[in-house]
UniProtKB/Swiss-Prot annotation:
It comes from Pyrobaculum arsenaticum (strain DSM 13514 / JCM 11321 / PZ6). Its cofactor is a divalent metal cation. This is 5'-nucleotidase SurE. The keyword Nucleotide-binding applies. A divalent metal cation binds at residues 8-9, 39, 93. Its EC number is 3.1.3.5. The keyword Hydrolase applies. Keywords: Cytoplasm, Hydrolase, Metal-binding, Nucleotide-binding. It is found in: Cytoplasm.
Amino acid sequence: MRILITNDDGVHSPGLRLLYEFASPLGAVDVVAPESPKSATGLGITLHKPLRMYETDLCGFKAVATSGTPSDTIYLAAYGLGRRYDLVLSGINLGDNTSLQVILSSGTLGAAFQAALLGIPAVAYSLHAQDWEEVLKNREALEIMKAVVQKSAEFVLKYGLPHGVDVVSINFPRNMKRGVKAKLVRAAKFRFAQKVDRRVDPRGSSYYWLYGTDLAPEPDTDVYTVLVEGQIAVTPLTLDLNALNTDRKLDAEALAKLVRYINEAI
């Protein structure tokens, strides 16, 4: 089995290293990731300039850094390196990727969706945290993430994604401890109230910052599960945006099996 690992936080992110370490026992692993952070790039690909790839040593393992977006890395790995992948793992992202509002702009999910477009099963992992220093001190949380990554990846390699699912998004809560459980939940529509902050530079020209303020989480969604309940949200996603498609049916039994598979490990 060959696994491709990527992210949107950049090739030097601790989350990428963790994902590599967690996934390595499952098969041959390639790491191809952006050379610098590319958050909120969604499914964006680079068409207006050439892309570069170069090998880099990340203190014990080799990775390929690219000048492109997370979505570009999928194309470059599949076609530039000419390799065939059984699974793509994207993450572990610093910051949760909950709600459709965030999912549709996320580079972490963008890479996973790009893999799905190429017919490769994909799982994206994100963590509700503000800095890696806090996370890396929590050995209990690291062991939980390791178990979830290994079991979810193992499940997809063994059984494939459940029918009707193109990507699985897994969001970890902050400060996880033993007893935490994975829950199968849908994505909320919104996570933030969108804001624009207009400012004026010393020359009198306007410039703008985009930001958001937290909304009250909607129950029975990924946002509520992670932020309020402190549990792990497992959210199946589909690429099919066609409103006229009434034929797509989810394999609920297989999805429930995936969550059981994860919970048995934590």
